[in-house]
Amino acid sequence: MSTPQFTEGEIDFDAPGAGKPCKTWYKVFGDLSSKTHRPLLVVHGGPGVVHQYLLPISQLATDYGIPVIFYDQIGNGNSTHLPELKDDKSFWTEALFRAELDNLIVKLGIQDDFAVLGHSWGGILGARLAVDHTPGLKRLILADSLTSMELWSRSLRELRAGLPQELQDTLRKHEEDGTIHSTEYQAAVGAYFQLHVCRLNPMPEELISTFAEMGKDPTVCVAMYGPTQFEVTGPLKDYNIEAELDKIEVPTLLINGKYDESRSYVIQKFFRPDSGRELDEVCAVQPHAAPGRA
């Protein structure tokens, strides 16, 4: 696999309440100025993840000439970090990340014609763009995403209940004891990830580096989602876009995996006869990472 050419940079982002200037870091594979192909803007998951695990998608630039844009959301990766706001749940909102995304689209000059791939939490932001009829959004891909946190949480409970009893006991013990950072608990979470996050063995380096970056600064993840994978305690716990789905008019491709946390019923309400829907029989929540899938 050849490595496509890329450029990277930072743009200013005015984040009310941040208390300091903020920047959004981005990386573009291919040439945005050519205008021969519609650019694809890739929105990473989390909240609190970084772009690295999605990098296999950059091969689209080499194979098809499609410019592919990645970025790290505020609080993550190469963008401005705000650990001093870790307890301020009024700051860490969906609206903040939507404003950052709008700012990025305009500053990169793609606001008249672009496509979005939103993965997991990134799909929440992508769906919001579509519901709001964002000008210039021509195509949408929602990968491993959700229509409501209630359905997502139900899926997590069911998948956890399917783990070997020993792993379930380990998870429960450390959660009750407040020792979720212990090696034993993290190993149990890792076993769950191997089943329902990425089944490739070994895991791709891009995903390993993503987890490492998350560990350096969990501010966004803990503030918006919660301290563990299995219970949503942050502002996202009440997320539900189902009443607005009929506003989505842009052609949309839905992707989830056979072993995915985003099980079919989690995304089913997105589905309409004029949308595409694919069930990947080999992947968990990282379909882009499977060989030949970029």
Could you tell me what each predicted segment is?
Residues A95-F114:
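Conserved acidic catalytic loop of the alpha/beta-hydrolase fold
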Residues R160-D246, V250:
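Alpha/beta-hydrolase
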